[in-house]
Amino acid sequence: MRTTDLRFDELHSLSREIYEEYFDVMPISEDQKTDRVLIAMALEDRFLEILSLAEIRQKQDKPWLGEIIELFTLAFLAVANRRVDDDEIRAKAERFGQEVGLSTFAHQGEEYFTSADRAINMSATEANAIMCYGELADAIKRGCTVKTWKTILDGREREWHHEEDGVTVPITEPFEVGGELMMYPLDDSLGASADNIANCRCCAIYS
């Protein structure tokens, strides 16, 4: 059954199960897993509304790209600020809004780009990104000096993420992952592409 065939309450129940399964395999505490699920669900609520609006706007003869970019940016920030509130998360929200807004605009008429499936995929990815950044910020405040990349080794991981598993670097220096620099898993602040980020279940351990 497609998620588009479900009522909202059924979709919410299904997506929670998806998020719980998605994050359950990560080598993090139960509290960290729960936080990721709750953030993903909050993001999903907002993303579904925006994608629905984008679908409507596509049928109207007036500009809508700027509106959708702003809505995605504000939605990301509203949820992310529950975990962390600083200049970096605000910059990340702006990058997210631009990227997702532009891709939605570029793929007008393609069902997936305004679908619940896309909202769920984005929510899982961005919930992990928000939490990974928050955990880095917390570790710096605690005085941790190193960080170790952890990859879920279940055959679904990217080959270069498999190779990165267990790599330890100073906390203020980036990992080099598949030729791209990342301060933490799912970090795009140094130019990492979606090839390194989308649906990534990696995390970092700090000491």
Question: What residues fall within each predicted segment?
Answer:
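N-terminal leader/targeting and assembly helices and adjacent pre-domain segments
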Residues: 1-142, 206-207
